[in-house]
Amino acid sequence: MPKWIRSTLNHIIPRRPFICSFNSFLLLKNVSHAKLSFSMSSRGFRSNNFIQAQLKHPSILSKEDLDLLSDSDDWEEPDCIQLETEKQEKKIITDIHKEDPVDKKPMRDKNVMNFINKDSPLSWNDMFKPSIIQPPQLISENSFDQSSQKKSRSTGFKNPLRPALKKESSFDELQNSSISQERSLEMINENEKKKMQFGEKIAVLTQRPSFTELQNDQDDSNLNPHNGVKVKIPICLSKEQESIIKLAENGHNIFYTGSAGTGKSILLREMIKVLKGIYGRENVAVTASTGLAACNIGGITIHSFAGIGLGKGDADKLYKKVRRSRKHLRRWENIGALVVDEISMLDAELLDKLDFIARKIRKNHQPFGGIQLIFCGDFFQLPPVSKDPNRPTKFAFESKAWKEGVKMTIMLQKVFRQRGDVKFIDMLNRMRLGNIDDETEREFKKLSRPLPDDEIIPAELYSTRMEVERANNSRLSKLPGQVHIFNAIDGGALEDEELKERLLQNFLAPKELHLKVGAQVMMVKNLDATLVNGSLGKVIEFMDPETYFCYEALTNDPSMPPEKLETWAENPSKLKAAMEREQSDGEESAVASRKSSVKEGFAKSDIGEPVSPLDSSVFDFMKRVKTDDEVVLENIKRKEQLMQTIHQNSAGKRRLPLVRFKASDMSTRMVLVEPEDWAIEDENEKPLVSRVQLPLMLAWSLSIHKSQGQTLPKVKVDLRRVFEKGQAYVALSRAVSREGLQVLNFDRTRIKAHQKVIDFYLTLSSAESAYKQLEADEQVKKRKLDYAPGPKYKAKSKSKSNSPAPISATTQSNSGIAAMLQRHSRKRFQLKKESNSNQVHSLVSDEPRGQDTEDHILE
């Protein structure tokens, strides 16, 4: 052992090898996982800084030092306490893959302490090579790619591991599951909680872990499911996804597509991070055709980005409108890349208008003025909304801008498998193409049975807004208790009342909102990073802002002395002053002033509802304290009484809904929902129409259009009034399996797909073949450059570098898609009814709706 280690340890624990709490090495079951966790007690141990320094710079450790990092396969659980200085979960990822130790005795905590004092070496099987240990990284930093030599970037999105996942599933199987559609997966595994119950740790992981390696044979039934340690499992991009990333890094304009479960959203989030690294954070426009799709990728609608309002009028008129807005003009001038999700719902005419605006503003005649384009979507889903019923729908790929600018059109083919229903997979694929046979029809009609009645309420999807409103109102009427009515305050400079009413319908916030305790609601505006358009929740109570201020203070500090509440209850002016101080500290004065005026105007519309006592369930968080101390119990009771007093003092004030929202990572968040404002502005940014309303809508039932992009555990779909191609497919593919799906009024004659979309998909390339063709073209270009006379050729080459030639490679898949999708055979290829089910079926992936996007789980 090196002298500096011996000296340090002798200084810390002289001649007392077993008194020190140096239980710092926890090694999990299998070496192939190579997972090493550190946790130390700060009591009686002063070398925390030493250990942290070595973790930050592991390359300076010698072989003897690294013996301490043994990967013994049967370590007893040490009695560890979390490092006080290590407050965040970190991980080290390595690419080492070691064979399981053979003929090696398990190493105990006691052996380590003996080794420290006796200077006895460990076996070489317990050693790591210094060169393969990487510096510690935060959870949100890079995670490993499929290739052991490459890194891929992870996002901050989390997704809970479904508890029904089979224990014997390997990491590779999980990697191909639809659950792995999130780049960062937050796993709380019941079988590993006891082993991981040592606080937050730094973990060494390889890219080949198996979940069977994390199993604990001991009974863990007494563990609290909410106290488990969260383990980050690196999720890898597939080879075809990496190929598309490389194409984007090379500056190419790309459209990629795929059916549900092929990882479109994961790839898009990764693509956005890559582009921001290239162009800068402010120079990448992240947009989508709809508000819900935009919030899923952290962007805004394409209309909002472009500054074109509703996009009505000719291109020149819209160009002049953008020119008058300095904010939107700068956007167009500065961006380097434009990302558009759900491109399928953007019509060709609007895309050409945007192209015209970009070329004129940037004074560049290349497509979109030289802006790099990344389009994503599935044209088999909902098409663009037709403004004129007499004019046929034109898809984005039919536009002039698309034909000139988007040269790489790619089909994602690798399916990330889940615990799926194979029969349901085939049924969805046939529905996607409008190719329903007798057997598929019989299977769908069997799904008309009611769903099991449990705590999860099925989301009801309807094709029209009227059906949605009727179903939501029916559910609301069945709830007990008082109805709270919130009327919107509408305004704006527009004098044409008919036009004004039509424009107001563009706001998701309803003109009149009826709520009760227990109502299921959806947020319809982005408020912050975790509370976004599409977040689902349940109304818990109604209270005024002053009562909520006290309630929030109490939930943040349940041990708060009751004297503080007594002061606020007896002196409402002091309570109001405390609220104003906190609000002014958290917001700029201009923002705070605007929000204050919005709230005041909304509060004046109150109709003077009677004040009902707060429900006892609101105070459940205080009742969780387990104690027999009479003083503590008396304080809890006193706090409840004071809260009721403060609430009763709010008579005549506007009471707002207290909503418990459920995030995609299954965590909950209590929020008092306050009014927000919406506006459609003119070119001078003055509101033509505006609305002040709570950003909520009833959400037992949703329209099929609003459901696109969501995954729902239980779905009830009524297809009686389906009127659009792709609408039925979107609705039914929200479900994960047949067990969670109820289908009413199924009619095969209403299940259709656009022939233009089928023809377009026959021209798509695979990602791998597109990248290979690109490499081949680059080689040809390089050879020509070697024989070219020089500057003259180089100038020509440079002028064409941003417009690569179309990729003419064929796609390849396990189902024989290569033979069908020959790009040069489009004119000769004819779809026949008898070949439709076999040939076109291979165009789509064979998975049901999984974790393609951020989950919105109904409570």
Swiss-Prot record:
UniProt binding sites for ATP: 258-265
Reactions catalysed, as given in the entry: Couples ATP hydrolysis with the unwinding of duplex DNA at the replication fork by translocating in the 5'-3' direction. This creates two antiparallel DNA single strands (ssDNA). The leading ssDNA polymer is the template for DNA polymerase III holoenzyme which synthesizes a continuous strand; ATP + H2O = ADP + phosphate + H(+)
Its EC number(s): 5.6.2.3
Region (Disordered), start-end ranges: 142-183, 782-859
Domain of life of the organism encoding this protein: Eukaryota
First and last residues of the transit peptide: 1-45
Cofactor(s) listed: Mg(2+); Mn(2+)
Biased composition (Polar residues): 142-157, 172-182
Induction record: Cell cycle-regulated. The nuclear isoform is present in very low amounts in G1 phase cells, but increases as cells progress through S phase, with a peak in late S/G2. The mitochondrial isoform follows a similar, but less pronounced induction pattern. The nuclear isoform is prone to APC/C-dependent degradation in G1, whereas the mitochondrial isoform is not.
Pfam families: PIF1, Pif1_2B_dom
DNA-binding region: 727-746
Compositional bias segments (type: Basic and acidic residues): 844-859
Residue(s) carrying Phosphoserine: 70, 72, 169, 584
Function description: DNA-dependent ATPase and 5'-3' DNA helicase required for the maintenance of both mitochondrial and nuclear genome stability. Efficiently unwinds G-quadruplex (G4) DNA structures and forked RNA-DNA hybrids. Appears to move along DNA in single nucleotide or base pair steps, powered by hydrolysis of 1 molecule of ATP. Processes at an unwinding rate of about 75 bp/s. Resolves G4 structures, preventing replication pausing and double-strand breaks (DSBs) at G4 motifs. Involved in the maintenance of telomeric DNA.
Homology family: Belongs to the helicase family. PIF1 subfamily.
Subunit comment: Monomer in solution. DNA binding induces dimerization. Associates with mitochondrial and telomeric DNA. Binding to mtDNA is non-specific and the protein seems to coat the entire mtDNA molecule. Binds to the telomerase RNA TLC1. Interacts with the mitochondrial single-strand DNA-binding protein RIM1.
This protein's name: ATP-dependent DNA helicase PIF1
High-level lineage: Eukaryota, Fungi, Dikarya, Ascomycota, Saccharomycotina
